[in-house]
Design a protein with these regions (language model features):
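Rossmann-fold NAD(P) dinucleotide-binding segment
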Residues: 1-3, 14-30
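C-terminal amphipathic alpha-helical segment
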Residues: 1-7, 53
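A general structural motif
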Residues: 9-16, 34-39
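Adenosine-phosphate binding glycine-rich loop
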Residues: 28-125
Length: 125
């Protein structure tokens, strides 16, 4: 962090974006594979304020869980898993991310807060 770049991509360690880490970012986008990139959810609030686009990790990394969940459901119902259905759902990830960013901009809430709310609504909690 602190190096000028287009995309900061945390891919190994979680909680790298704490108050100090966010302040040191010199990028336009944060998008990576590490789980729990934000040390605390409120650290995500500072990203849009600084003009940094944040892609919540569990959204952009959803392909694996989509595949596993469909395999599980197919087994539970004694049906073969259709790889085309998996691919179709994975192909929706960019659209979902766009929805998150649009709602974030519209509502003033951070992308992480918006993504969490959408996830809770989808799973019924």
């Amino acid at each position: 962090m602190g190096v000028a770049c287009d995309v900061f991509s945390p891919n190994a360690l979680g909680a790298v974006l704490d108050e100090e880490g966010v302040a040191r970012l010199d990028c336009q986008v944060v998008a990576g594979g590490a789980n729990n990139q934000l040390a605390r959810p409120e650290h995500g609030e500072a990203l849009p304020e600084r003009g940094i686009l944040y892609a919540p990790a569990y959204v952009i990394n959803a392909g694996g869980i989509i595949n596993v969940s469909l395999e599980y459901l197919c087994r539970q119902h004694g049906k073969p898993c259709d790889i085309n259905e998996v691919r179709k759902r994975i192909a929706q990830i960019p659209d979902r991310l766009g929805e998150i960013w649009r709602e974030s901009e519209r509502s003033g809430r951070s992308p992480g807060v918006v993504a969490d709310a959408m996830a809770r609504k989808l799973i019924g909690r």
